[in-house]
Amino acid sequence: MTWKLGDEEPASNGGRGTDDALTVTRILEASDIPCCLVGISALIFYGAARLRPDWEIAIPTELIGKAAQLLQSEPHSANYSLVEPWPEPSMSLLHTYHRFKGKGTNFYFILVPAQDVHIVCEPSNITRSLRGLPYPKLSVFIQSCLDTRNELQLCDVVDGTDLPEEWGEENLQLEGFNDVEWAKDINKRGCEFENGKFAHWSPFAWDAPKSRREMWQSKVRTKKDRLDWTKPDHVYITQYRIIGDPDPWTILSDDY
């Protein structure tokens, strides 16, 4: 069941907005703007049970202005409007980005500079859901979690995919540490945005070094520890995966 909010229609796919997001990505790609869905959307694609308020669409940083202008120009301005930025504190710069809303619906999306999620947004790094939505390849997404020291996302994608430890040794760059200089830049920009208006929300990224391999090992070795009495280990293999279930990204879903 979907609920109508005042005069607004629910987003597509029972309020999820999945086909709405697909339309936006196709508009961008038709104008030679590569893109991929990141943040909570990527976590859902890779099996995590998360609630998604807004769709985060990563775009090459140098093309953000072009994308924002495209969506505010005819004919697309008839369907989308620029709205107030993301209103809540978060370990990110979401509050500094272009945020759009589907006119007459409760579909929201945010244009995210790819450098701010430590992803190179190019076709070779992108895979697609069965609906055709673009997502970062699994190795690309997990590498970004390690490089940005986003251990919450890392935990969720590990539990959504149930990857073994050796997968990381074969597919990830585990030597060294998270990108401290990247984090310092994120924190600097977050604190300076609008003359320091949001500085009290800091930090926006963790800028202390931590071993990539240590982060990876600590999450893949503790999957069972994150089960509780509601998810017994004779039914669940991780907090998000039931034993024997197919990989979520291999099935057609209204969520992705």
How would you name each of these model-derived features?
Residues 51-53, 73-77, 127-129:
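Generic alpha-helical propensity signal that fires on short helical segments
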Residues 20-68, 230-232, 236-239, 250, ...:
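Active-site nucleotide-donor binding segment shared across nucleotidyl transfer reactions
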Residues 90-256:
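Catalytic cores of NTP-dependent nucleotidyl/adenyl transfer enzymes across multiple folds
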Residues 11, 21, 30, 42, ...:
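A sequence-composition feature that detects small, non-aromatic residues
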